[in-house]
């Protein structure tokens, strides 16, 4: 793609670019307090572009104009303020509100604003600390230190708390080689939770893939970068659990927050206008589209530049569906051929909820895979089930029945989120 999507700094000013192929027009919305200034964007091959004389720290969003025809996959509503899919920082957390789903109701006061970032250094990331065969510790960032007495109160429940000496000492005592952070990018509660007085605590309902939830990193990306540096010094790598299979905009009754309002037919897999639900969340992203894959790859590069060792891909089979699972899907080659990503740790959750979605052992060379057969057979042996000794031996020696000749690809686990 010739135009860099998201925000980029040019000699002529700050450039904003967003894909909206079916939109009649798109507006850039700049915010000064509650005042909204709208600027028409120019269209170039389905990408809408605007240049404004604004500085880092400027708050912004988009409005897309076009037809409302859900049966055709078109869900435009210019009253909805839309968050930039390439945003790297937000001014607040997402809060579910029923008005986010109501057509014709303005949502400028209900959604976070993206923040124009300062230019980033583009130095190549250091090689991963973690090597396959090491011990991975999965954790929820907020819950892990929320009540830890040794962590200062202002740090508890944040990413920076993970680099506190008491936390690092705990990891070292356990022999941890890498921590795997459950989703840290900005997410929204599912609509059934607020009426019950509940919140989504785990974060598996993301809205935009590159912006860390402000509650976990009040100081922005630098807090993740600094934490990664501190943990690397202790010999501990960082792996991010990424949800690139769906967005928190849910089904046809869900909120319009970003991708749905900009380019639903591009981003969501929706043949004949019907949203596919192989993630059990109301929608899935369509990785057969090059625009969607570009966003996914941009997300991986973005976090790789911050020094993370690699990624665990939630419901990873969805990334290779077209509509069925394809072990030669374009996303695999694009990751393998990307200079920033070639040496990153790649871990697949090798299943989804769709037809023939269980694909353990079928990901390409270079990928590790969560091995639920190890989990089940070890648990059965511990429980005392008869006839399990042979299966236990197979699991303890690399699951050769699944990973023939590639036993080092198995990620063995007994418990997870």
Stretch-by-stretch model annotation:
Residues 1-11, 36, 43-46, 54-138, ...:
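The feature marks proteins involved in alpha-glucan
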Residues 55, 128-133, 172-173, 339-341, ...:
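Extracellular/periplasmic catalytic domains that process cell-envelope and extracellular macromolecules
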Residues 27-29:
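Beta-strand signatures of extracellular beta-sandwich domains
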Residues 140-310, 316-335:
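Substrate-binding/active-site clefts of carbohydrate-active enzymes
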